[in-house]
Amino acid sequence: MSMDMTTRMFKEEGWIRKKCPKCGKYFWTLDPDRETCGDPPCDEYQFIGKPGIPKKYTLDEMREKFLSFFEKHESYPHGRVKRYPVLPRWRDDVLLVGASIMDFQPWVISGEADPPANPLTISQPSIRFTDIDNVGITGRHFTIFEMMAHHAFNYPGKPIYWMDETVELAFEFFTKELKMKPEDITFKENPWAGGGNAGPAFEVLYRGLEVATLVFMQYKKAPADADPSQVVEIKGDYYVPMETRVVDTGYGLERLVWMSHGTPTAYDAVLGYVIEPLKKMAGVEKIDERILMENSRLAGMFDIEDMGDLRYLREQVAKRVGISVEELEKAVRPYELIYAIADHTKALTFMLADGVIPSNVKAGYLARLLIRKSIRHLRELGLEIPLAEIVAMHIKELSPTFPEFKEMEDVILDIINVEEKRYAETLRRGSDLVKREIAKLKKKGINELPLEKLILFYESHGLTPEIVAEVAEKEGIKVNIPDNFYTLVAKEAEKQAEKKEAAEYVVDFELVKDLPDTRTLYYEDPFMKEFDARVLKVIADWVVLDQTAFYPEGGGQPYDTGVLEVNGEKVKVTNVQKVGKVILHKVEKPELFKEGVTVHGRLDWDRRIQHMRHHTGTHVLMGALVRVLGKHVWQAGSQLHTDWARLDISHYKRITEEELREIERLANRVVMENRKVTWEWLPRTEAEMKYGFRLYQGGVVPGRVIRVLKIEDWDVQACGGTHLPNTGLIGPIKILRTERIQDGVERIIFAAGEAAINWMQETERLLKRTAEIFRVPPEKVPETAERFFNEWKEARKEVEKLRKELAKLLVYELQEKVEKVGNVEFIGAVVEGTIDDLREAANRLRKENRVVVLISREGHFVVAVGDGLDLKAGELAKVITSVAGGGGGGRKELAQGRIKNPLKAEEAIEEVKKMLG
């Protein structure tokens, strides 16, 4: 892409455009003597030990300095916007927020929703795993950082500001507010592309550090049929102009604070409250600061993901400071581990506070990665402290700015403790898993563990590569751990989130795209049972009406059924679906329907009202779950039926009986209070600002305007389902059971209204019947059942004892029947007893040079072969079944089965003897 990026400021204030001889990129500078662009690796850090900002700032001070500057700017006042959660509930194509612009994708960028302010300023906590293997080493990389930004959305005919103003605002902030030296600032031209958008951009560099990026987003991915004259190429992809042009900036909060301190690493400047206690706990020796400074200067020019070799960095640093690589490693490794722990635990604090539940999928997988990587680092440092202790340090430090951390503290720390215990259990089981895999590799003559197996051990079993290597190398198998291992696994997880399946419709969208939107009578009056409508189109066995009271399947609520009356004949409606904004009804006799004909619809009301009870009941139950279990609870799915409903929630451990009783009690209290249930259509941004992102409990809701359902002082969600006007109409809510359907997800099965009454009546009937059988009153059933169970257990013990005695007698009797067949001792007999009796006796009789064949009168058989014989019990079992039918199998030394014809048992034993002889 070629574009003139000469701004007003560059032209009027004497800036010079130069080409960097090292990277070949163009940049702007006020310094006529400057040769290079200022970006590593073209330039080293020039602020380590010599801060580039006169005043030392804390994170809070720098953030406020930035936001206030833009909020109160005389010419361009910006609306200050609160941070968004790092878990992006408003979109389903990414796992975590990695930049401030992601807060406004896709809805604001596409024009489907208005921005909360325009222009706006924000400081957005952002999490990126693409740099995880650099964290702790380079001094500048974080998994969690705050991207301070100012954004302007230039809609057609409504310009705000563009390149000239953006560059001037950045320069003004840096030089007038932070007192940076103008001649040391460079603006490097480097086009940007990401998330399907692109545009020209400046990287703002100061003394070797990129402190901001100014992107002018004006292109979107080109469709296949794009006008060639409109297409531009940026970084190998093709784009066309967007209607909305967006100023997308990002200023690194941590980097600017680091610049003001000039410490060897950014971690020292912003995470000291964790780093210093960890250094004391680990007994880390203070080292020559020159080593850390030189390490940082060179590491700033290094990226593990690009170079893939940490050893190269070590060699270069060691050479510069005049020590061996081993001495350098010993000196800096503890610092790198502590830096990484401090960063990872801060990221975890944000993730868990915003509702991420550690698991094996999606964002939960990335949270678990951070937990286990941090634990591993602690162990390498020789520290046995709980990880929760470090997370608590972050909560204490950050809560004044992020009060939600204090509110969520108990849950956050409990999650960490639960995960640490799970990891310990994983490690106990892990060694055997690795050994089994190694045995398979050895059989194939492979002496190195493939990378895909290393990743599989981590993803499926949570075994870090270091643990796998430790076990494998003891077994003589080499393990090569890539320096960017964690980056690889994180990228794979993020790729899975980007995969979106295309919508599948019951009929081709092209067949209905020209039809008017179907009028949704079920929203206008959810209690409408009958209606008249006109047929607009018939497509196979689907009928399109101009309006309908039939609810189409969606949002976990099943479709309505009923009848459509046409020309005096009642036709069953068996399915209702929505394609775009057109509703289709599947009918049994489509040939009766003609375009323009008026029909009369009648719903199966019993089905609909029960769906409504369960749907409103789901919202009531969700409110109770959040209040009892915590704000981390999030809806992970739901499905309604007439007899029962299910609600899946994110939760990190099993729900206890006590918690279930409290949840059920709260839900039924809300029902009895007969709270109002109301709904309204609101512009998306207004709804988000009014109610927050808990709106999206049921998932991402498309559209500029969304339907918001409110249960008075209890629950608010964006929801497209049909609901009751008050909670009293739900009737009783009864939780039937809970299930753990996957890691981090609990399923609650419940019934409401008539379905709950039916369940309670059936339970009562069964209780009464059980009481009759025991001949006790219903209230005595539990203790009576327990008594019977204990008596049964005692009787079972006695039976087992007698069985063993019988087996001893059987063994004693059979030992008298040993005969010599060829070179083998042989015992063969038809006996009384169960398969367990036979197995017990055969195992007792089995000796090194002996074969035992026992067949019961019911047809069960057991074959035992001594260890000293070159025979397989399974082969002898085949001889038995070849004579008497049936089947069986087993290990080399023991096989069992059942024959079809017990009358041929003796004959089968003789056949085995023949084979041995």
UniProtKB/Swiss-Prot annotation:
Q: Name where it mostly resides.
A: cytoplasm
**Would I find Hydrolase among this entry's keywords?**
no
Domain of life assignment: Archaea
Q: Which UniProt keywords apply?
A: Aminoacyl-tRNA synthetase, ATP-binding, Cytoplasm, Ligase, Metal-binding, Nucleotide-binding, Protein biosynthesis, RNA-binding, tRNA-binding, Zinc
Where, by residue number, does Zn(2+) bind? Answer: 615, 619, 719, 723
- Coiled-coil-forming residues are none
Q: Which reaction does it catalyse?
A: tRNA(Ala) + L-alanine + ATP = L-alanyl-tRNA(Ala) + AMP + diphosphate
The EC category is ligase
Gene Ontology CC: one annotated term: cytoplasm
Regarding protein family, the annotation reads: Belongs to the class-II aminoacyl-tRNA synthetase family.
Query: What does the UniProt function comment say about this protein?
Result: Catalyzes the attachment of alanine to tRNA(Ala) in a two-step reaction: alanine is first activated by ATP to form Ala-AMP and then transferred to the acceptor end of tRNA(Ala). Also edits incorrectly charged Ser-tRNA(Ala) and Gly-tRNA(Ala) via its editing domain.
Which NCBIfam families does UniProt cross-reference here? A-tRNA_syn_arch (TIGR03683), alaS (TIGR00344)
Protein name per Swiss-Prot or TrEMBL: Alanine--tRNA ligase
Give the species this sequence originates from: Thermococcus kodakarensis (strain ATCC BAA-918 / JCM 12380 / KOD1) (Pyrococcus kodakaraensis (strain KOD1))
Q: Show the taxonomic lineage.
A: Archaea, Methanobacteriati, Methanobacteriota, Thermococci, Thermococcales
What's the gene?
alaS
